[in-house]
Amino acid sequence: MNKKEINSSSANAQSNGWTFQYVAALVVFLENMGLAKQFCVEGTEDIVVILKNNEKICAQAKSGLDQDSIVSLHFDRIMLSIETLAANTDAIQLISISNFHKPLGDDDAFSYMQFLDKKNFENLTTKTQNKIKQKSEEKGYMLDFNKFKLWFIRFEGAEPEQGLAHYLNSKLEKINPNQYFSVDDLMEKWLNIIQLNARDKENNIETEMICGTLFGKVLNSTQLSQIIKLIDLELDPCYEEDFERFFKNYFSRNSQIFKIYTLITADYDVFVNNTKPKKREQYKLFVESYCKQENIPNDIKTFFENYDEKEQLSLDFYKLFIAYVCYKKNVVNSIREVFGYEDN
């Protein structure tokens, strides 16, 4: 996307379509993903996360490109965010978000080395607390300081959105350190969702939409070689291309069938609970005990019916399918754990 003219005093400092507001909205959502039901962006600076209990978190995003400008200018922008936040008396959190390192002075500076740094109001120095309270009283802002938080998000330089990429990668590495997709692609999909929401004043972004994109990216990037390695399968290299051809279509189609998925994963859970194998051996030991020639689905047998080693190849592929379903279950659970997300 083409870069637009930058307004250094608004939330809309841009990099390839990533406005600071969009980054801030996504981060607020991800940091509260376990509790979130929906979120939205409103106007040019407002961010709202609606929780499962229908309570809400309100945030204001203020950005600037000149970190060397005098502190008072940055502080004034923080106060502008407080003006709007104070009106949201029904919110349980009120967050002022900026990319200013020192909007409150040296004593309450944010960590420049971190992509995300958070400060609760009570953790600020007494001097800063009194300054904010005094300014709020002078302007008539009735802010509940027990709910008030300040966040710093690093968003500057030639490619400011790369801070978000590193932030996401640090989370995704906990799910799958050998991921085979670009986090930039995931960010681009999320950007499109948020951009559409910014123009759509009627509907919020559902948690399931963001999570579904994440689940799909992680699982659709799974390589056949990963599953082969999981179960230490010795596959003749001359058959790898045929297996690869059948792999994506069969796995994506059949692992989505609820009955198949739940039956396999239920048996897998029972096996793991009863035998308590080492984690690195779970998949291999399970498929060896679970996969029998008589249980191979007919569509797998049909695919290999013209091969000389059709029985062994069918069994090998069936083992890969069973291992993939169990792998998928564990990946989904890892995503939920890392992002604190549970199905409604």
Model-derived features: positions:
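Acidic metal-coordinating catalytic centers involved in nucleic-acid phosphodiester chemistry
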Residues: 1-12, 64-318, 331-335, 339
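Short, hydrophobic/amphipathic alpha-helical patches that form generic packing surfaces
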Residues: 21-30, 316-340
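Catalytic centers of nucleases
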Residues: 15, 19-83
